[in-house]
């Protein structure tokens, strides 16, 4: 039997300033994984979270 797909999906959030910022504490890009409800949040998610590479709170956008 095929499993029914749930409403919640796992997404990846990526720091928007790590790609362009060169004055970082350490090299790399900050990524968080979380889940979202497909029915309630249909668009791309944007959350302000702490980036350890930039050493500040930045906007993290959904990439996949």
Curated annotation (Swiss-Prot):
Q: Which InterPro entries match?
A: Ribosomal_bL33 (IPR001705), Ribosomal_bL33_CS (IPR018264), Ribosomal_bL33_sf (IPR038584), Ribosomal_zn-bd (IPR011332)
Give the domain of life: Bacteria
Cellular compartments per GO CC: cytoplasm; ribonucleoprotein complex; ribosome
Give the record's keywords alphabetically: Ribonucleoprotein, Ribosomal protein
Q: Name one GO molecular function term.
A: structural constituent of ribosome
Spell out the family assignment given in the record's similarity comment. Belongs to the bacterial ribosomal protein bL33 family.
Alphabetized NCBIfam families for the sequence: PRK00504.1, PRK00595.1, rpmG_bact
Name-wise, this protein is: Large ribosomal subunit protein bL33
Species per Swiss-Prot/TrEMBL record: Rippkaea orientalis (strain PCC 8801 / RF-1)
* Gene coding for it: rpmG
């Amino acid at each position: 039997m095929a499993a029914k797909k749930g409403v919640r999906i796992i997404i990846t959030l990526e720091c928007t300033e790590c790609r362009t910022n060169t004055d970082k504490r350490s090299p790399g890009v900050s990524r968080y994984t979380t889940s979202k409800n497909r029915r309630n949040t249909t668009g791309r998610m944007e959350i302000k979270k702490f980036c350890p590479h930039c050493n500040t709170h930045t906007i993290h956008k959904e990439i996949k």
